[in-house]
Swiss-Prot record:
Subcellular location: Cytoplasm
Principal cellular location given in the protein's record: cytoplasm
Keyword Amino-acid biosynthesis: no
Protein name: Elongation factor G
Record InterPro entries: EF-G-like_DII, EFG_II, EFG_III, EFG_III/V, EFG_IV, EFG_V, EFG_V-like, G_TR_CS
A Pfam family reported for this protein in Swiss-Prot or TrEMBL: EFG_IV
Domain tr-type G: 8-283
Length: 691
């Protein structure tokens, strides 16, 4: 089947926002108007088409980004729905990596919220062009102009209005289109298919002219001909305006702002027009950089079917009907079912079995995919999130994604032998789907440890274990992922000798052990000259060091940011072995950590509390009691926003405490910021508990 749409007619975009800004509802309406779903799913009824995991339908939040294809004005839209909850920012990072543009949805009443800032910064990192949709204009307290001001104040954006609202709250009727200078009014609530273009209401005429002038001035800045015509008194016509706004979005010169109410079916069609008119196609985004698999030189792939095939796997899901499905974006070339491709990130061969085009929860089998497509592949064996699949003859590795380290962990104990087996299978699948979720086994207790980005993140994983995989298990209390770090440079000379008749054991090692830069991790270097320790024993030395890294000397937590140099040693022709050097290295490293003033590090979270003013005193007092350091506060609407750095150890159960003293009116978000040393008194308690 040949290509149905030219690559210039593709729009790969995501919808990003804070939790509850109405992102999934907006997506639902888009799917409705583009003719894909005949009954609109409402999030608060737990029936939204994009939220298809049971956990999402119950909690009314979107956890996994489902990719969906639909059509508008004969353009092909691939929408990726992204979660807005802070524990799932990894999902957002993944989807932004493969998007060409984004729609940022704001809650008309709340403006730019903490998670909007996080997502906006992530979009800046990947240089994603975006338009802004101010949603919920029908809500009490909705304030379009405050939202526009927020974009400047809170995320340093450059908003330029393409629309103004007509009325607000319950009297919100429609929008003024500043390019056409017409009012668009929706009649009734009936799925908003009927709207009329009329003249701008007299009372809004002056405001419309003022904002139209701002829009025109922002546009003509981008084009010398348009600028000189404008200075001669000629405003650009409609087509020129659209071309200039499109150029502005591509260059990120400004962010166009639209408004509406997705729930009340107002403003969605003009938003779709804006996606088509202003967001870039894969061709506009241009070439993508990569590393040549053989030469390791930098190379590029162009978004065209004639270039060698390359695609990036950005999401893995376990589907009850199809098995493992891998969502991929094709960057160049084309691929057919049955093709043999190379996973260049892991140097493994893969075969393309089934290829699916996804609508939120139903799927269509396709035979080939082209540059710009977002498809799901069933049955890949070795591919993980962030891997590149490509033409084996012209192999390339597209840039890697970076994934944050988990900061919170819980122990899981299966209740029976049968559960033990099911748990193993389930956890390996969950870890493959989500790189920010790690699984390990505690060597001493034999418990299985799950690590994640926050309490909600782990809650949902446990829920999936129980429901989807039917694993019955006891779940421990959440624990903080402490770390240990050396503070002083040490030189250690250690000899391991064991003589028990027959072959003995002998190994001598001399190490220089010193603290590494924060975040630099562990590094080992052998500076042996003249064969004082033969090459074949060096792996034994490394194995010994690695065994200590997993469990430090203070309380058995992983050791971070340490640099070890092997500077000297000695061996015996008969009695030395890799095992002897492993034992010597382990003992020497432990001694260095004991003498080198090891300290305990803890994760510190960046916390933002949004609270009505009357509770500010209680919030600050409570954060101080949790060893928090207040970074600052400001007003947002009539609420007070308090920013603080608080150790994760003191944040467990905070959500319930905050709800109780603010009668449920305050809320907070937190995300990992950095590790820092635990104060002496606290450290002693932790060591006593775990050692």
């Amino acid at each position: 089947m040949p290509r149905t749409h030219a690559i210039e007619d593709y729009r790969n975009f995501g919808i990003m926002a804070h939790i509850d800004a109405g992102k999934t509802t907006t997506t639902e309406r888009i799917l409705y108007y583009t003719g894909k779903s005949h009954k609109i799913g409402e999030v608060h009824e737990g029936a939204a088409t994009m939220d298809w995991m049971a956990q999402e339908q119950e909690r009314g939040i979107t956890i996994t980004s489902a990719a969906t294809t639909c059509f508008w004005r004969d353009k092909r839209l691939n929408i990726i729905d992204t979660p807005g909850h802070v524990d799932f920012t990894i999902e957002v990072e993944r989807s932004l990596r493969v998007l060409d543009g984004a729609v940022c949805v704001l809650d008309g009443n709340q403006g730019v919220e903490p998670q909007t800032e996080t997502v906006w910064r992530q979009a800046d990192k990947y240089d994603v062009p975006r338009v802004v949709f101010v949603n919920k204009m029908d809500k009490i307290g909705a304030d379009f102009f405050k939202c526009v001001a927020d974009i400047i104040d809170r995320v340093a954006g450059k908003p330029v209005c393409l629309q103004l609202p007509i009325g607000a709250e319950s009297s919100f009727q429609g929008v003024i289109d500043l390019i056409k200078m017409k009012a668009i009014v929706w009649s009734g609530e009936a799925l908003g298919a009927n709207f009329d273009e009329t003249e701008i209401p007299a009372d809004l005429k002056d405001q419309a002219v003022e904002y139209r002038t701002k829009l025109v001035e922002a546009c003509v800045e981008l084009d010398d001909d348009a600028m000189s015509a404008y200075l001669d008194g000629n405003e650009p016509d409609e087509a020129t305006m659209r071309t200039l706004v499109r150029k502005a979005v591509q260059l990120r010169a400004f962010h166009p702002v639209l408004c509406g109410s997705a729930f009340k079916n107002k403003g969605v069609q003009p938003l779709l027009d804006a996606v088509v008119d202003y967001l870039p196609s894969p061709a506009d985004r241009g070439e993508i950089k990569g590393i040549d698999f053989k030469t390791e030189e930098e190379t590029v792939r162009h978004p065209s079917d004639s270039d060698p095939f390359s695609m990036l796997a950005f999401k893995i899901m376990d589907d009850p009907h199809v098995g493992t499905i891998t969502f991929c974006r094709v960057y160049s070339g084309k691929v057919e079912t049955g093709a043999n491709v190379l996973n260049s990130s892991r140097d493994k061969k893969e075969r393309v079995g089934r290829m699916l085009l996804m609508h939120a929860n139903n799927r269509e089998d396709i035979k080939e995919a082209f540059a710009g497509d977002i498809v799901a592949l069933a049955g890949l064996k070795d591919t993980r999130t962030g891997d590149t699949l490509c033409d084996p003859q012209k192999a390339v590795i597209l840039e890697k994604m970076e994934f944050p380290e988990p900061v919170i962990e819980i122990a899981v104990e299966p209740k029976s032998k049968a559960d033990q087996e099911k748990l193993g299978i389930a956890l390996s699948k969950l870890a493959a789907e989500d790189p920010s979720f790690r699984v390990s086994t505690d060597q001493e207790s034999g418990q299985t440890i799950l690590k994640g980005m926050g309490e909600l993140h782990l809650d949902i994983k446990v829920d999936i274990l129980r429901r989807t995989y039917k694993v019955d298990a006891n779940i421990g209390q959440p624990q903080v992922a402490y770390r240990e770090k050396l503070t002083r440079r040490q030189e250690i000379d250690y000899t391991h000798k064991k003589q028990t008749g027959g072959t003995g054991q002998f190994a001598r090692v001399k190490f220089v052990v010193e603290p590494n830069e924060p975040g630099a991790g562990f590094s080992f270097e052998s500076k042996i000259v003249g064969g004082a320790v033969p090459k074949e024993y060096i792996p034994g030395v490394e194995k010994g060091l690695n065994s200590v890294l997993g469990a430090g000397v203070l309380a058995g937590f992983p050791v971070v940011d340490v640099k070890v140099e092997l500077v000297d040693g000695a061996y015996h022709d008969v009695d030395s072995s890799a095992l002897a050097f492993e034992i010597a290295s382990r003992a020497a490293f432990r001694e260095a950590l004991q003498k080198g003033g090891s300290v305990l590090l803890e994760p510190v979270m960046k916390v933002e509390v949004v609270s009505p003013e009357e509770y500010t005193g209680s919030v600050i007092g409570d954060l101080n009691a949790r060893r928090g350091q207040i970074q600052g506060q400001d007003m947002r609407g009539n609420a007070n926003v308090i920013n603080a750095m608080v150790p994760l150890a003191n944040m467990f159960g905070y959500v319930n405490q905050l709800r109780s003293f603010s009668q449920g009116r305050a809320n907070f978000t937190m995300q990992f910021d950095h590790y820092e040393e635990v104060p002496r008194g606290e450290a002693d308690k932790v060591i006593a508990k775990y050692a």
